[in-house]
């Protein structure tokens, strides 16, 4: 059994992952922004922890992570504007990596997106620039850490039913540029399948030190992650 803290615990993917992790026998703490979300967290068997990641002090972040052996980052600003996007998707994510190292945590899984790279090529006036730059900088901070890290890069998220399968590959193999979903929706993937990749990646040593890009596909998730 692992003691896992999910940062961004009330997001759709995090809620599914939290439930699955509890069902797998893990002890899960879900960090949430509002006390109004506590009931939903308790309903999936996780322990709610109210923590505004954007405003949290270093001491509060340290306290939230202390006592856990695994950190899952599944938070995001959700298109709330450039300032908040950088504050959450970059700054808070980077601070969580630092806090995890101070706490002696070894395992970390960060949910990013397919195609994340500092070489994204977008100009600063592009609408997507704050998001892609913030995520890329956060990913790089995790890569340079002492943690046993995995970065997950799923494609466009949908509310489709889970398939239990994925297809691995970089952005270029799933429809080209970031505005393209591919002719057959190859870059799409259900939130439930992303949640399952979190659950499976956590206990697979094969995923440590990897940025795993994926979308919809035909390979069972654990089999794909083991490659």
Can you say where each PLM-predicted feature lies in the sequence?
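NAD(P)H-binding glycine-rich loop region in Rossmannoid oxidoreductase-like domains
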Residues: 30-95, 99-102, 202-206
């Amino acid at each position: 059994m692992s003691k896992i803290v999910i940062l961004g615990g009330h997001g759709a993917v995090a809620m599914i992952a939290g439930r699955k992790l509890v069902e797998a026998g893990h002890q899960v703490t879900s960090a949430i922004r509002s006390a109004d979300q506590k009931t939903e967290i308790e309903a999936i068997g996780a322990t709610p922890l109210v923590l505004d990641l954007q405003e949290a002090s270093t001491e509060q972040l340290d306290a939230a992570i202390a006592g856990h052996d695994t950190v899952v980052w599944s938070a995001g600003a959700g298109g709330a504007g450039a300032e908040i996007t950088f504050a959450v998707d970059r700054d808070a994510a980077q601070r969580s990596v630092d806090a995890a190292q101070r706490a002696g945590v070894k395992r970390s899984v960060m949910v990013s997106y397919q195609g994340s790279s500092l070489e994204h090529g977008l100009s600063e006036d592009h609408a997507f620039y704050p998001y892609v730059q913030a995520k890329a900088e956060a990913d790089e901070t995790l890569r340079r850490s002492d943690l046993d890290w995995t970065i997950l890069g799923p494609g466009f998220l949908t509310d489709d039913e889970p398939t239990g399968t994925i297809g691995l590959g970089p952005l270029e193999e799933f429809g080209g540029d970031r505005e393209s979903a591919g002719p057959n929706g190859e870059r799409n993937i259900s939130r439930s399948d992303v949640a399952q990749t979190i659950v499976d990646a956590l206990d697979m040593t094969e995923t440590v030190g990897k940025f795993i890009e994926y979308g919809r596909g035909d390979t069972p998730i654990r089999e794909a992650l083991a490659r």
